[in-house]
């Protein structure tokens, strides 16, 4: 039967295919069945030939090593009669019937589920909400206009820009500026941002979630609000989901799945998850991508690229590599809608944990998966933060907390392939207390050479050697080796001396350390590659989960054996060739500095002589006063623009009252231009203020 399904020639792909070999859903099935009919799921109707053959084996080992229930060959031959259009009997739990296609046109061969009242699906999932429909959202309509979408995106960006400008401008606070007022305004803007992002749909929700990991780029209030963006996107209809699956997998739902649950168990920005049962009885989940997502991404990312380029050019957005950040986000977004990539990730992750029996990773059903549809083994569990359900099952919460961290340490330190989004929705606990991972769309990889550098960083942190820490950060490209790094060294030394030397009772949480790191990085030439920010965020999320599960939880305790193992490793390395190398290097350093010393003294003497004789002149620039003068000029210009803008506005109003609308409009436009110039000047002043604070 599998061959029948796979060999169907159909209209999904938009072209007639004629497949007679037994490719298919499960290579363990050797069914081969022959028939001929007309098949159509789109507007065109096509002829196709079906072959079906089945071995005499009553059962075989299928995917996942489980047995596959099969219908005897004789039975299949009997049922072959149904192919020619007459209502058929069931084959492997489904029946072949003649019916009309979705357009009500040509006769179509579909496989209808066997009429049965018994459901093969497990009992309904607890806590699944009835999700609202996505109808009514402009982005949910696959045929939205690209122009309208671009207008929506730009309106949002411009509104955000103006709001931020007002939040940061002291003159925009009626009754005087205070930090409290600014914080409360920022919170308002952040909450407006979250709502707008939800309205803008999938691309922006996903980007919002990604931004919530970047405390190094965005203000605290924004990061807090964006991290609340739990994919609250409405679900799309089951009809839409089923049509999409059929188009992607190239066969009718009833042919592929014995049962398909219409109500999704989860809906997210990029897709939704339905439970289903395969014809061999295996319980699966089908992750279906939101139709039209690629088109939406294309439009949105085109606009976002322009925005990133503008940010990059504009002084007021700092020195961040906005185009680089955009490219990173675009890569992640496109990767997330490539379910083949997710399936490969799941397979690799499953392989990495094959010897650890307390971690479960769902098996991928490759034959039922494609770019936009992913079928996975159904592995239900209690969400890791659902304390009541965990307690009801008598699970050991402290052990779960330790295991969650340990599993992550294994990913970072041993396999180098890590889950970049371990939020509580993606972690569950199985009946045997093992940890289940879901969602492999966003995975990170720490390549061997990066891992080696990270270990060096770890050792230098352990030795509290600020210079080495900085060199390792430069090697990791997390720090730019430009300009005067003495202030960076002081920050690093402060970090090493204060934050890492606390006794266990003073120990800070990882989240707090991460925040401190980002705070330091805001004033320094640090550039945290997204891999690090993901790792830091992942650890602080897991640490948070750890505290929820067990108030006594200590990250340090769980990580200690791993750290010790690494230090032992280093010690063993040092005892060998490295020690010899180190001694040789020290000898070299001593020799070269002894040799160069007289030359250096001579150079200093020459400088002093040149100064004495007046041959060498020192030109001193007082940068502070230069900046102050520049600021005064900008403010002067801003005042002039305000006066001119106000005057034109008055003239406009006067002319408008007198009925000379043309002149009035001209004046209004002029006033608008001057107002924009005022905003621009304020931006530049802010930028100078910020710069002054940094140095
Ligand atoms: N193999 C599985 N077995 C049981 N339930 C699953 C399985 N895969 C996913 N789920 C359920 O569906 C939910 C959403 O799945 P998943 O996270 O993979 O989707 P997503 O679209 O990537 O969502 P998000 O972006 O929010 O992480 C999970 O939290 C889990 O409850």
UniProtKB/Swiss-Prot annotation:
Chain's role: Involved in resistance to oxidative stress. Influences responses to reactive oxygen species (ROS) production. Regulates plastoglobules formation in thylakoids. Together with OSA1, regulates iron distribution within the chloroplast and mediates the oxidative stress response. Together with ABC1K8, influences chloroplast lipid synthesis/accumulation and modulates chloroplast membrane composition in response to stress.
Keywords: ATP-binding, Chloroplast, Kinase, Lipid metabolism, Membrane, Nucleotide-binding, Plastid, Stress response, Thylakoid, Transferase, Transit peptide, Transmembrane, Transmembrane helix
Induction data: Down-regulated in response to iron deprivation.
Phenotypic effect of disruption: Larger plastoglobules associated with thylakoids characterized by VTE1 accumulation and high tocopherol content. The pale green double mutant atsia1 atosa1 accumulates ferritin and superoxides, exhibits an increased nonphotochemical quenching (NPQ), and have a reduced tolerance to reactive oxygen species (ROS). Lower levels of the highly unsaturated lipid digalactosyldiacylglycerol (DGDG) and of different forms of monogalactosyldiacylglycerol (MGDG) and kaempferol. The abc1k7 abc1k8 double mutant accumulates strong levels of oxylipin-conjugated MGDG and DGDG.
Listed PANTHER family: CHAPERONE-ACTIVITY OF BC1 COMPLEX CABC1 -RELATED, PROTEIN ACTIVITY OF BC1 COMPLEX KINASE 7, CHLOROPLASTIC
Residues the entry annotates as binding ATP: 265-273, 287
Catalytic activity reported: L-seryl-[protein] + ATP = O-phospho-L-seryl-[protein] + ADP + H(+); L-threonyl-[protein] + ATP = O-phospho-L-threonyl-[protein] + ADP + H(+)
Protein name as it appears in the record: Protein ACTIVITY OF BC1 COMPLEX KINASE 7, chloroplastic
Known EC number: 2.7.11.1
GO cellular component: chloroplast thylakoid membrane; plastoglobule
GO annotation, biological process: cellular response to oxidative stress; membrane lipid biosynthetic process; regulation of response to reactive oxygen species; response to iron ion starvation; response to oxidative stress
Tissue/organ expression: Mostly expressed in leaves and flowers, and, to a lower extent, in roots.
Family annotation (InterPro entries): ABC1_dom, Kinase-like_dom_sf, UbiB_kinase
Domain of life where this protein originates: Eukaryota
Transmembrane segments annotated in the record for this chain: 633-653, 659-679
Protein localization: Plastid, Chloroplast thylakoid membrane; Plastid, Chloroplast, Plastoglobule
């Amino acid at each position: 039967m599998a061959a029948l399904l796979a060999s169907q020639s159909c209209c999904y792909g938009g072209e007639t295919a004629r497949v007679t070999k037994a490719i298919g859903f499960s290579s363990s099935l050797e069914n081969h069945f022959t028939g001929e009919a007309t098949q159509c799921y789109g507007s065109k109707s096509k002829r196709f030939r079906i072959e079906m053959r089945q071995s005499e084996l009553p059962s075989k080992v299928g995917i996942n090593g489980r047995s596959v229930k099969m219908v005897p060959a004789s039975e299949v031959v009997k049922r072959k009669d149904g192919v020619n259009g007459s209502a058929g009997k069931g084959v492997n739990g489904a029946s072949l019937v003649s019916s009309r296609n979705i357009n009500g046109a040509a006769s179509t061969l579909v496989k209808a589920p066997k009429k049965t009242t018994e459901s093969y699906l497990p009992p309904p999932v607890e806590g699944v909400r009835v999700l609202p429909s996505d109808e009514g959202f402009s982005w949910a309509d696959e045929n939205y206009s690209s122009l309208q979408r671009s207008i929506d995106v730009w309106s949002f960006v411009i509104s955000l820009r103006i709001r931020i400008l007002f939040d940061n401008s002291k003159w925009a606070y009626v009754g005087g500026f205070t930090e409290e007022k600014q914080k409360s305004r920022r919170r308002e803007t952040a909450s407006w941002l979250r709502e707008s992002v939800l309205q803008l749909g999938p691309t922006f929700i996903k980007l919002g979630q990604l931004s919530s990991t970047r405390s190094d780029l965005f203000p605290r209030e924004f990061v807090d609000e964006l991290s609340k963006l739990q994919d609250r996107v409405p679900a799309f209809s089951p009809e839409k989901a089923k049509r999409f699956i059929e188009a992607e997998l190239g066969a009718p739902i009833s042919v592929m799945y014995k049962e398909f649950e219409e109500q999704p168990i989860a809906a997210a920005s990029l897709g939704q998850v339905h439970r289903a049962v395969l014809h061999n009885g295996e319980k699966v989940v089908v992750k279906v991508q939101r139709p039209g997502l690629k088109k939406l991404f294309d439009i949105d990312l085109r606009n976002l690229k322009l925005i990133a380029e503008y940010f990059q050019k504009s002084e007021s957005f700092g020195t961040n590599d906005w185009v680089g950040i955009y490219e990173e986000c675009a890569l992640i977004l496109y990767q997330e809608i490539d379910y083949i990539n997710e399936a490969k990730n799941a397979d690799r992750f499953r392989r990495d944990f094959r010897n650890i029996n307390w971690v479960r990773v769902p098996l991928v059903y490759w034959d039922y998966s494609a770019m936009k549809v992913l079928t996975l083994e159904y592995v239900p569990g209690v969400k890791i933060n659902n304390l009541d359900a965990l307690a009801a099952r008598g699970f050991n919460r402290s052990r779960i907390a330790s295991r969650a961290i340990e599993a992550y340490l294994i990913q970072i330190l041993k396999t180098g392939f890590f889950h970049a989004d371990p939020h509580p929705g993606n972690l569950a606990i199985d009946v045997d207390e093992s940890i289940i991972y879901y969602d492999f769309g966003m995975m990170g990889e720490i390549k061997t050479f990066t891992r080696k550098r990270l270990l060096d960083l770890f050792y230098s942190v352990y030795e509290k050697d600020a210079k080495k820490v900085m060199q390792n950060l430069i090697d990791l490209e997390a720090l730019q080796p430009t300009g005067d790094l003495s202030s960076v060294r002081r920050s690093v030394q402060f970090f090493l001396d204060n934050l890492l030397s606390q006794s266990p009772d003073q120990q800070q949480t990882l989240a707090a350390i991460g925040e401190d790191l980002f705070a330091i990085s805001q004033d320094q030439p640090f550039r945290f590659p997204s891999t690090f920010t993901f790792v830091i965020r992942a650890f602080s999320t897991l640490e948070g989960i750890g505290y929820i599960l067990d108030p006594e939880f200590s990250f340090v305790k769980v990580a200690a054996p791993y750290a010790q193992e690494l230090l032992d490793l280093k010690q063993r390395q040092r005892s060998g060739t490295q020690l010899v190398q180190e001694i040789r290097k020290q000898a070299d350093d001593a020799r070269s500095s002894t040799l160069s010393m007289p030359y250096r003294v001579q150079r200093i003497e020459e400088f002093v002589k040149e100064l004495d004789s007046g041959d060498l002149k020192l030109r001193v620039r007082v940068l502070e006063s230069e900046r102050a003068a520049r600021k005064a000029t900008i403010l002067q210009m801003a005042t002039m623009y305000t006066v001119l803008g106000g005057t034109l506005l008055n003239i406009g109003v006067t002319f408008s009252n007198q009925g000379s609308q043309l002149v009035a409009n001209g004046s209004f436009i002029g006033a608008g231009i001057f107002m924009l110039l005022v905003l621009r000047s304020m931006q530049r002043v802010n930028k100078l203020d910020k710069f002054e604070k940094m140095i």
